[in-house]
Amino acid sequence: MVGSHKASGVLLVLLVVMATTIANGTPVVDKAKNAATAVEDTAKNAATAVGGAAASVGAKVSGAKPGAAVDVKASGAKGDSKTDDSAAFAAAWKEACAAGSTITVPKGEYMVESLEFKGPCKGPVTLELNGNFKAPATVKTTKPHAGWIDFENIADFTLNGNKAIFDGQGSLAWKANDCAKTGKCNSLPINIRFTGLTNSKINSITSTNSKLFHMNILNCKNITLSDIGIDAPPESLNTDGIHIGRSNGVNLIGAKIKTGDDCVSIGDGTENLIVENVECGPGHGISIGSLGRYPNEQPVKGVTVRKCLIKNTDNGVRIKTWPGSPPGIASNILFEDITMDNVSLPVLIDQEYCPYGHCKAGVPSQVKLSDVTIKGIKGTSATKVAVKLMCSKGVPCTNIALSDINLVHNGKEGPAVSACSNIKPILSGKLVPAACTEVAKPGP
């Protein structure tokens, strides 16, 4: 079509030139050549423009637009609670990670053997969930600290759960758990692992019946978890709700946790952590530690736990370190505005923590605790000892402040008491029970 327009144009120009030449006496051949060249260049430019437009349209038709959402069902997922959808999720992640886009998960129950969502990715990635996940019920040992579902080395990641449930089906695993005999508790999968995430958000997900820990946050920086649910019965052994370690700038804002171990456990290398508006119970409370079990542990610094409700748990807020430990540090810690409801040992520092007898009993812990503030703690204690501060003989606690504590016990043993060892706390405000009226001893 361009060719026919080109020929018509050339003929028209030649006629005009010839007429002008006859009138002005200018050589016809030179004028005609110049006119023909101009028309040909115009035609080439037009053809190039048309061809470029066609190529662009072809690219859009033949390939997915960068950043477009990837539907996991388009990648082959069934969501029928029976088919293993692991391969479909892997394919969807590969596509979304390469483009920096969103994965959408429609309603359904997705059975997955295991999943690995690994970066780095080309750009920010969002996982938008409207379905639930279910693990196999069978018990399989894994490499230490492995996860059922892993998110690893991703920046600017968002997980919008929309109340999605990750069901680890752990009841058979709890029966097979032999931690009490061996002290080895890491051969079962963690429900969800977040490793090496930066500038990321985890919103509105629930982990149920994990075979081991529910969530593990390791080597992360600047991530926020909100509207988190953890649900497992009290008999689920070693099912810490959310464990945080070797991470900086983690914010846990809003969680309801019921489990068989610590609701929140804070491991070595944790810095600048905020835990806020957490409801905990049943479980073992909110704990820093245990620390000092392994060599080369990193300091814990800048931990704030505030505005929490702890109910029907074995402990409230506590710091626990192993006797006979290598040197370590935990400092700049704040427990504030926390309500206890029928909690055993609501406030506890235990530097002789020795579960299952796997420790060097009688050898002082070398983890130094300092600059700890325990403020605004109120409610009821299920045990007569409501505050127990048992620090290390080797490196006694320093700058431990107690302020505005009101914990009551209505049992047959009498009113609540406070027991201390190797510590001279800084006291302020009203303290019930009165501080350090008894000597702290190992044991519950």
Swiss-Prot record:
Family matches, as SMART domains: PbH1 (SM00710)
Glycan attachment points: 222, 342
One Gene Ontology biological process: carbohydrate metabolic process
InterPro entries, A to Z: Glyco_hydro_28, PbH1, Pectin_lyas_fold, Pectin_lyase_fold/virulence
GO molecular function: galacturan 1,4-alpha-galacturonidase activity; polygalacturonase activity
Compartment(s): Secreted; Secreted, Cell wall
Disulphide bridges, residue numbers: 263-280, 391-397, 420-436
Pfam families: Glyco_hydro_28
Signal sequence interval, chain numbering: 1-23
Recorded catalytic activity of this chain's protein: [(1->4)-alpha-D-galacturonosyl](n) + H2O = alpha-D-galacturonate + [(1->4)-alpha-D-galacturonosyl](n-1)
GO cellular component: extracellular region
Active site: 261 (proton donor), 284
PbH1 repeats: from-to residues: 220-246, 247-268, 270-290, 300-321, 330-351
Protein family (similarity comment): Belongs to the glycosyl hydrolase 28 family.
Function description: May function in depolymerizing pectin during pollen development, germination, and tube growth. Acts as an exo-polygalacturonase.
Protein's name in the database: Exopolygalacturonase clone GBGA483
Species of origin: Arabidopsis thaliana
